[in-house]
């Protein structure tokens, strides 16, 4: 798999994460500068009331993309209990 194919796989997984966590995972529109595509992903951190940002670039090698993706998923695992609590509160309001 070449690096652009790998980038497509990583970004498609991120879009699935966004759809599963309404408003808690934000994805900035993909940008391209000098042939390098980049995608910024923000994970909501309730404790700090802000987003932790991760940037994925098509110029990264597979190892860098994989490491960044694993770090992001690890952060999501830590945040999941808080996200579940937020989601329950949202459902109760409706």
Task: List each model region and its residues.
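Negatively charged, low-complexity tracts enriched in Asp/Glu with abundant Ser/Thr
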Residues: 1-24
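Generic short amphipathic/hydrophobic targeting helices enriched at N-termini
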Residues: 5-6, 10, 29, 74, ...
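N-terminal compositionally biased, intrinsically disordered segments and leader/signal-like regions
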Residues: 12-13, 56, 76
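Acidic, low-complexity, intrinsically disordered interaction modules
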Residues: 20-73
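Mixed-charge, Lys/Arg-enriched low-complexity segments
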Residues: 59-94
């Amino acid at each position: 798999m070449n690096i652009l194919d790998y980038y497509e796989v990583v970004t498609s997984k991120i879009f699935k994460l966004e759809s599963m966590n309404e408003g808690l995972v934000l994805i900035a529109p993909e940008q391209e500068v000098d042939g390098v595509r980049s995608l910024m992903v923000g994970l909501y951190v309730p404790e700090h009331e802000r987003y932790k940002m991760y940037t994925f670039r098509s110029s990264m090698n597979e190892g860098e993309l994989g490491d960044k993706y694993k770090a992001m998923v690890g952060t999501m695992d830590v945040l999941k209990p808080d996200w579940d609590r937020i989601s329950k509160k949202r459902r109760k309001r409706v």
